[in-house]
Amino acid sequence: IVIRKESYRKFEADKFSLLEEVKQVNIGNARSASLSIGLGLNTATYAQSYNYARVAIDLALARGGDQAVVKDCHGITYFGGKKEQTSKNTRVKARVKAEALREFIVAKDQVIIMGHKIADADCLGACMGIYRAAKELEKKAHIVMNEVTSSVRPLYDEIAESPAYEKDIFLTSEQAMDYINDNTMVVVVDTNKPQMTECPELLKKTKTIAVLDHHRQSSVGIENAVLSYIEPYSSSSCEMVAEVLQYIVDDIRFPNVEADCLYAGIMIDTQNFMNRTGVRTFEAAAFLRR
């Protein structure tokens, strides 16, 4: 759809009120309708405007929909997106992403996992889940963690001091840069912003990067990822990883401390299952309790 600039200015002036108006449409539908809009502006050609619009609509959908995203040569602007995310019960997407992740891991000799800086329980839990997947597929695995906060210290110490784990399960950024090679895959969890990761430099050292995150897609994302699983509907990254694990390895079993890490991540991010909790959240928790 091509619109005049003056029409866009009207939409901009009323903050894309159309997004709210469409929710009032009721023709017997059980759920309220929502709208996602992507616009490309201020370019030299229609083709470039179209490309900007495609990027904008993809970004709007990745962030959960119900919003307008406008991209031009100066940057990206967001409108709307106030609707609380509702869980999708289908597991098709999780299964497809899990199978793809498995294939990428199998193709490499080593997996380096990292989350965001100043890791919380959800970040550590998701890291441990991917670590377990890599180990079950008989791959070397390491987790990048520079600063250990008090919120994850007990679990971190239990893992680091356990003889069941390698001494180099946890690496600093400097150590990770020494470990990485051409046969290394990097998996980023609980963030999709490159500068928020524990070691942004790692992202430039490998061509095989996977991203799993429950936060809305950032306008400055990890562009060279071969696999991106961004699910704003999930309560936590631990919920996503717990679900993915069930498709990567059949009848997977892992130590209690790893289950505790994943369960703690879900508990903290949902505030004891009080917020942003759906059917799949409880199913992930039940899987971990088993």
Predicted regions and their residues:
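Active-site cofactor/cluster-binding pocket
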Residues: 169-224
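A short glycine-enriched loop-to-beta-strand structural element that forms part of the catalytic core
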Residues: 1-2, 28-54, 67-72
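A structured phosphate/pyrophosphate-recognition subdomain
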Residues: 95-98, 105-119, 126-139, 219-290
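Short, solvent-exposed amphipathic alpha-helical segments in soluble enzyme
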Residues: 54-55, 128-133, 160, 202-205, ...
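C-di-GMP signaling machinery
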Residues: 47, 72-108
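Anionic-ligand anchoring segments at beta-strand to alpha-helix junctions in alpha/beta enzyme folds, i.e.
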Residues: 108, 112-182
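Catalytic-core segments of nucleotide cyclases and related cyclic-nucleotide turnover enzymes
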Residues: 12-23, 42-65
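Short beta-strand->loop micro-motif that forms the acidic, two-metal-ion catalytic signature
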Residues: 1-9
